A protein has these predicted regions:
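AMP-binding/adenylate-forming catalytic core of the ANL superfamily
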Residues: 31, 134, 139-140, 155, ...
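Gly/Ser/Thr-rich phosphate-binding loop
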Residues: 2-5, 22-30, 39-100, 111, ...
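Conserved beta-loop-beta connector loops within the AMP-binding
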Residues: 113-131, 150, 168-169, 231-235, ...
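ATP-dependent adenylate-forming carboxylate-activation enzymes
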Residues: 5-24, 189-197
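Acidic/polar alpha-helix N-cap and adjacent early helical turns
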Residues: 275-281
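Conserved ATP/PPi-binding loop(s) of AMP-dependent carboxylate-activating enzymes
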Residues: 105-109, 120-151, 187-189
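Active-site glycine-centered loops adjacent to acidic/histidine catalytic or metal-binding residues
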Residues: 59, 83, 104, 162, ...
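Beta-strand->loop->alpha-helix junctions that form or flank phosphate-binding loops
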Residues: 79-85, 104-106, 210-213, 255
Length: 281
């Protein structure tokens, strides 16, 4: 808008309408679900996005498989970014230096750090809570001093509630929400690590891993899968595919489902999966 570019809003995501609109656009901003739907349409090819300069994604992690399929189909890459209502965009991949599975480096003027449960800063490669600091960070929540106290430090850092790690170059990789972390038998399990492996299995469209109450372990790992037509998987198949992961991370049960429940922003609503407010098969 600052450069005088036209912004076109569509009333809803309909694949054919979006493909038609791409012909007169240069930038597309979407969530991973949108890219998956575009790739499912035979009309989406290099010619359909010939005028495009930039594709960006946010709000939810994009699988490495979707990244690879998009590049193979179009010859372009999707630039993943990281932001939130409290601070706008904080980090981004560079258009000439995209790493699938990462949301890139902090933008100029912003800082990102990873801390443990005691608030101590962790080293590169260690997983913990993502904290951010920068000029666009909001001053606080409206009439919510309790929320401010829980999320802000005295020196200006904001606790995002996201779990992630920084590599040796300070590139950020997200593992999920701290509220999504599963504690089973006293061990911390990050669902994204399991989902990334499951999503690579032939015939799996997408997956979601959640924890549900378990009398012995506190929480049991449960997997929900969306499968291609005619494909079936059972727990034994899943165990074989997940052989690279520690045994305690393997799902105790799995359910196939027509589609993962999502909100308007395309984020998977794992709370509905935890409380069985879906129709697993």
């Amino acid at each position: 808008m600052l450069s005088g570019a036209q912004v076109r809003f569509l009333p809803r995501f309909e694949t054919d309408l979006v493909i038609n609109a791409l012909a007169g656009a240069t930038v597309f901003m979407g969530v991973p679900t949108y890219y998956h739907r575009l790739l499912s349409n035979h009309r989406f090819d290099p010619a359909a996005c010939g005028s495009m300069r930039l594709f960006t994604s946010g709000s939810a992690p994009m699988t490495t498989l979707t990244h690879a399929e998009f590049t193979e189909r179009t010859g372009r890459q999707v630039v993943e970014r990281y932001g939130m209502s409290e601070a706008s965009i904080i980090a981004s991949n560079r258009i000439d230096n995209v790493l699938a599975g990462s949301v890139g480096h902090a933008l100029p003027g912003y800082e990102i750090r990873i801390v443990d449960d005691e608030g101590d800063v962790l080293e590169a490669g260690e997983t913990g809570t993502v904290e951010v600091r920068g000029p666009s960070l909001s001053s606080g929540y409206w009439n919510r001093p309790d929320a401010d106290a829980d999320s802000r430090t005295g020196d200006g850092w904001f606790s995002t509630g996201d779990v992630g790690s920084l590599d040796s170059t300070d590139r950020l990789t997200l593992e999920g929400r701290s509220s999504d972390m599963i504690i089973s038998g006293g061990l911390n399990i990050y669902p994204k690590e399991i989902e990334m492996v499951i999503d690579e299995i032939d015939g799996v469209v997408e997956s979601a891993v959640v924890g549900k109450p378990d009398q012995d372990f506190g929480e049991a790992v449960i997997a929900y899968l969306v499968l291609e037509p005619g494909i079936s998987l059972d727990v034994l198949d899943l165990d074989t595919a997940l052989s690279s992961l520690a045994r305690f991370k393997h799902p105790k049960s799995l359910h196939t489902i027509d589609a993962l429940p999502r909100n308007a922003m395309g984020k998977v609503q794992k709370n509905l999966l935890r409380t069985n407010q879906t129709n697993p098969q």
